[in-house]
Design a protein with these regions (language model features):
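Alpha-helical cap/lid subdomain in secreted, periplasmic
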Residues: 1-147, 151-169, 177-181
Length: 182
């Protein structure tokens, strides 16, 4: 998946590097996806090096938080080692880091365990033309959830005063809840 991106890079392109959600899955059914933290860091460094070789600009993004809550309704940290690895590599290679892990978890906390489901691909039969039989997917986002994650990234680009911030026309909106949800 990376090579076509690397091959098409041009000077001045921005490359947002976000991996880790699947890499840390140790469950037997996901064994082929698992990447140890040291190998994960090697992959990040490879992407940074190849991006810079094309005079493009890398930006690291921590893995998006999993939608996991404890019994009291507190959003749980689920990517500790991998998020730390992103920050270590970012510091070592002087690459900005957007902490989507922390910021998405903060959004989940605001929404709570029930309302956070409105970000997910949880569709009833007939609800969406692309999924006529419905879809129950707690990992991937629906359009609204994806837009909320993009909003977090845009806001952090502005907050960090990255060069790219001058090209962002929107962002810095206060967190909102899906208007369709009552």
């Amino acid at each position: 998946l990376w090579q076509p991106v690397a091959d098409s890079l041009q000077e001045g392109d921005y490359v947002f590097i976000q991996i880790g959600h699947n890499d840390e899955a140790k469950e037997p059914q996901y064994a082929a996806r698992y990447t140890s933290v040291p190998d994960y860091k090697i992959n990040l460094i490879k992407f940074i090096t190849e991006t810079r070789a094309k005079k493009a600009i890398p930006i690291l993004v921590t893995p998006v938080s999993r939608r996991k809550f404890d019994k009291e309704g507190n959003a749980q940290e689920t990517h500790t080692e991998y998020t730390a690895a992103v920050f270590e590599v970012g510091k070592q290679y002087n690459v900005p880091v957007i902490d989507l892990d922390k910021k998405s978890r903060e959004l989940y906390q605001v929404l709570g365990p029930k309302r956070v489901q409105y970000l997910a691909m949880a569709l009833d039969t007939g609800e969406h033309p692309n999924y006529p039989n419905g879809q129950k997917d707690n990992t991937h986002f629906n359009e609204y959830g994806a837009r909320r994650m993009a909003e977090i990234v845009l806001n952090d680009i502005k907050a960090q005063h990255l060069e790219l911030a001058d090209r962002i026309v929107k962002g810095m909106n206060a967190p909102t809840v899906n208007p369709q949800v009552k």
